[in-house]
Amino acid sequence: MSPSAPEQKPQLQQQQQQQQQGSSSGDSSSGSVNDSKSVTPAPSATSSTSQSSTAPSTSSDDNLICRWNACNQKFPAPEALYEHICERHVGRKSTNNLNLTCQWNSCRTTTVKRDHITSHIRVHVPLKPHKCEFCGKSFKRPQDLKKHVKTHADDSVLVRPSQDPQGGLNYRPQPPKGPSSYYDHTGQMRTNAAAFAHQAGHPSGGYYAPQPSTNYGLYFNQPPINNARTEHLGYSAAAGGYDRKRTYDMVDDFFGSAKRRQIDPSSYAQIGRSLMPLHGNLSVPNGPMTATEQYMPQPAPAPVHAGPTPSQNPLAQQYYLPMPSARTQKDLIHIDTILGQMQDTIYENANHATAGVHIHHAENGFNGYRNTPSPPTSHRSPTGMHVGADGYQPVSAASMASPMTAISSTGTPAVTPPSSSMSYTSGHSPSPSSSAMSPQSRHGSTASVMYPTLPTSLPAVSQGFGHSATTTLGPSFDGSERRRYSGGMLQRARAGPLPLPHEDTSGASTPKASESALSVGSPSSESDVSDATREREEQYDRWLENMRVIETLREYVRGRLERKEFVEDNESPQSSHSDAMDVDPKSPQAPPRELGTPREGSSLYPILRMPGA
């Protein structure tokens, strides 16, 4: 631009002369004018550039002038201006000159604290002491820098993923191994980028919810955490300690009520009411249960087996969890005996609780209480109500099944004979071309499918749950279907009284004897579920929860007995005998008496020693 400045005046004169010429020379003059314009800037352009070069210095000087009321004092640096406003105009409460109203020009912003107004003053003062380590951009307030750094954290996730070979799903974040994962735009690593590792979106931070551990038999549920958390999960024990302590107290109260015989072990109603507060609070893992609840303070064991990602046991607290009702070995044995009686009572009420409810098996659940090598099968109740994966109780038998689903010793289903099983395709029509569950591939005879055979002699119910009854016969191949066929007619059970047998209009012959035994209902939509059926489902769910809680508590007590996690009774022999809580008034047989202990009845009354005796 500077070499063309001396030629500016002659070119302007030439331009004026060319504009005064005739039309014959107009084209050539316009070309020369265009050439002069293209290489030589206008006078206004040169003046504007010179003004723009001096504008920053002038504007910076104006920004360093105090505009608080009529102060107009000029400062050499933004730091000096900011300190002047805070000390001179805002003041302090200790010097009795605190001013909480901003008087910069016409701002008039009023705050309630001195820290607030000093932070507000940064808006007016060109002071930007907070500099970004990634891009070098400066900010006036620390919260502005904090928001800006989050954008760099998101960029680092997209550009440079985590170098952690474990996938970043650790429960506790590991210390940094070498350089951090934050990089600037030139690929250079920042040394202090680890200070922002907790901001958001970093995959190697490790702030994720723990997976359920399979190493503990009794632990309490924690709310699922599906998003990244900004705080360290190592401090979550204080937040969730209230719920764990509350559940722990409920278990202790239940043990105390059972020891004091406030719960009748032979009454299913009392057992159900006492176990109701524990429903949903105790968890049974899907793996082997070893009942390693940390009763005494010790660090959580580090598992080395292969399987799901282990995590810290919620019960593995680093402090002593007292349970007064289950402290000694005698207490644990007594509680285990009472729990066994309650479990037998719940078993005895299985027929009443599971009447009319189909026992649904999960894919990875237990297929019965008996550990036999027989194949898992699904069964149907007399009314044929099926509780499917999208029904009322999705996982009603995921971890524990009813005794009705037990497998007999011969390897066949105890409830349903194999000959009465049916299969059908996705079109809800019986077809010999069913692939996986075809009756032809399992039985080899169509007659055995169309005409189920009944056993010649049925055992009594008192022989156990492994035997079948007449009213419990039904198809067994109903893994994912919602309806069944009986006699070639689309039918479904309903909760009303047993209707009259319907005649088959499809032309297929129907065995009338099996029709009466299978309690056939009229066709209806799947949404037509009566209140009685829904009530039976809820009753079955309560029975199933009672079974789960009792089994969990028994394994917890047995685990403590096996590991000898109880307080040793080192007291005198007089205090080691059974007290009033351990006496069962309903038991006809007295507890065994040990040698050297007082006779029966002495524990009920104090022994007064006479002087000199």
UniProtKB/Swiss-Prot annotation:
SMART domains: ZnF_C2H2. Residues 1-61, 146-186, 371-391, 406-535, 565-613 are annotated as: Disordered. Residues 11-60, 417-441 have a biased composition (Low complexity). Transmembrane segments: none annotated. Residues 442-460, 506-517 have a biased composition (Polar residues). It comes from the Eukaryota. Activated by C-terminal proteolytic cleavage by signaling protease (probably palB/RIM13) at neutral to alkaline ambient pH. Residues 146-157 have a biased composition (Basic and acidic residues). A motif (YPX[LI] motif 1) lies at residues 451-454. One of its GO terms (cellular component) is cytoplasm. Pfam families: zf-C2H2. InterPro entries: pacC/RIM101 (IPR050806), Znf_C2H2_sf (IPR036236), Znf_C2H2_type (IPR013087). It is found in: Cytoplasm; Nucleus. A motif (YPX[LI] motif 2) lies at residues 605-608. PROSITE patterns: ZINC_FINGER_C2H2_1 (PS00028), ZINC_FINGER_C2H2_2 (PS50157). One of its GO terms (molecular function) is zinc ion binding. Keywords: Activator, Cytoplasm, DNA-binding, Metal-binding, Nucleus, Repeat, Repressor, Transcription, Transcription regulation, Zinc, Zinc-finger. Gene3D superfamilies: Classic Zinc Finger (3.30.160.60). GO terms for biological process: positive regulation of transcription by RNA polymerase II. Belongs to the pacC/RIM101 family. Binds to DNA. PANTHER family: PH-RESPONSE TRANSCRIPTION FACTOR PACC/RIM101, PH-RESPONSE TRANSCRIPTION FACTOR PACC_RIM101. This is pH-response transcription factor pacC/RIM101. It comes from Gibberella moniliformis (Maize ear and stalk rot fungus).
